[in-house]
């Protein structure tokens, strides 16, 4: 199955950013908070309050007003909105101004559905336009009288044309969501979330003192459990009245660090029975805050026993003690993402943060051709979540559209450029009343590494949303983005940033193991899910966990081939250099051999002439000539871009390449390899023929790996065997004699000219001139091949 390269490639687009007034280079043109998106014009209608002045008709005085707003085929109403005690709603409705010519505002009596009055506004002449930072349009009272039914009411409202820059945009009820239940409209609104920063809590259980078992005739076998929130960790079992553990139990907590750690000592009476012999609780605020890489002091803590214990003949209070180190490790960065997709490396304490490096701005323009997981559903209620650092941004939900337009812009502070921005697009399942318990469905993700983004350029591209499954590579649509990174730091701070530590110093002074990092990352994800689920509107847990989902570690033949090709590409240049040098030695032609000897002779004996040539003006002229040739070549290669850069400072950057199908072995896909990659563990495949075929394929691959590992082990064992020969006295004596002879030769050849002659003679021998040439193996190589290895001992 071959993938279409053009279909899955990043395409360059040319939107009208900033309403055709945005500059491509922020240094040379006007910018605004929305210069990376296309301007969207809306008709805003703010319905604030109604007043009932009816005095003639008694039934009119108990009116329950409802406002209906109509533009073309779109209709919105306050019917399902909660009404205040003074008949106020204070709700903003937003319509696409191109959907009609006349805006109709109708006031009705809700219980009887009686029309009280109607107001019509012509869009072409009667509605003003507001562009921030202009002041808000003042609301007006409109008389809504009906002489036939004796309704005398007034409606306070305001109507204006605006864009997505307007302050009411995040709280507006859009016309495409008019069918959404009023209680669910909040789930369609855009929002920015700041996740609380995370910190490690280190509980080091050192030892116990004077521990007493419930059974006085038994030596206690105790382990310690510590619980913070929903996470419980325990130590190993240690026996004795003064057991020792010296074991770290590390938790993850979020600011403002108000939790409590509960510690229990469990005595293992036998394999089936356990009993608690002591408890202790400590608040996080009582622990030692470590803001530099260090260790907390070890202190003794009295344990609260389940039953009071008093030794015989002693009236003093008796208490077992536990020696511990309790600290909040604020000098670490808590990883919530995998290393490849990390977007933040800062420590918990703000004093350890590096200087601000730059600003990242993202314009989420829209999407095209979206496909949901449910093929029966023709439309999608989609929204985008962008995550960088602890700041999450969520666009509004565009209802019933496979090609939504958002045109929302967000920005982030960047402290490290070697990070990744993650954007996920989801199908909103929370906007219908009957889908209260349904989860939002992920459509796909796009990741943009910042180290591939050049500063001061605006990348406007359409990124494919790819989903890889057992059936192959599937395109779920395209996400249109405008990306810009601008440096804020200047001078030394900017150019020294690539050389500073990627992680806080504590990660290098007291590093955590990969096993610990994976376990703590799982804790961090759960805490983030819980924290963001408590916001309003909530960023749901399934969305947060999907955005923080790490790379799969399942076995994949496709990825194995990919990693081999990557490794081969890295060492290809080294292998090429080695092959060129080896070809000089192995060839029968004399020309390359004499060239090598000539170059060696010049560098060994004519160094004065080389020094004169380097310090002369001739070399400087040659370097300047090379620079001119390089610049002319670039100018002639793309004259239009050079002209734009020189006169307009406006160069369209090339599209960012985020996925290399050939490198990832996705240009030609083996469906069985994909089925094996996405198979569960243990395997859920029931077809024995398929399992046998996969097993035979793996055996063939591992056969080559086995032989390669065996050859490498054999050569290494022969090298070790050469050192074991030194244990023999005769060999040691010969080695000392050879060392003495070598030192004698070095001393005799210490003169510069003699040393150069010795080096030149060695080069002459190494290149194997015709009179030195010998196709038979060298004596040292013959000796090395005769050294023993453990391969002979294997059965």
Curated annotation (Swiss-Prot):
As for subcellular location, the record says: Endoplasmic reticulum membrane
Residues that hold Ca(2+) 1 according to the record: 57, 109
Tissue-specific expression? Expressed in root vascular tissues and meristems. Observed in flowers.
Regarding the membrane, this protein is recorded as: Multi-pass membrane protein
* Pfam families assigned to the protein according to its UniProt record, in alphabetical order: C2 (PF00168), PRT_C (PF08372)
SUPFAM superfamilies under this entry?
A: C2 domain (Calcium/lipid-binding domain, CaLB) (SSF49562)
**Which keywords does this chain's UniProt record carry?**
Calcium, Endoplasmic reticulum, Membrane, Metal-binding, Repeat, Transmembrane, Transmembrane helix
A cellular-component GO term for this protein? endoplasmic reticulum membrane
Q: Which cofactor does it need?
A: Ca(2+)
- UniProt keyword Acetylation present: no
Task: Quote one Gene Ontology molecular function term.
Answer: metal ion binding
Annotated membrane-spanning segments are 590-610, 612-632, 730-750, 752-772
Give the domain of life. Eukaryota
Principal place of residence: endoplasmic reticulum
According to the entry, every stretch annotated as the C2 domain falls at 24-142, 180-298, 341-463
Q: Which residues bind Ca(2+) 2?
A: 57, 109, 113
Q: Does the keyword DNA repair apply?
A: no
Homology family: Belongs to the MCTP family.
Q: What does this protein do?
A: May function as a signaling molecule by regulating the trafficking of other regulators.
Protein name stated in the entry: Multiple C2 domain and transmembrane region protein 12
Q: Which organism is it from?
A: Arabidopsis thaliana (Mouse-ear cress)
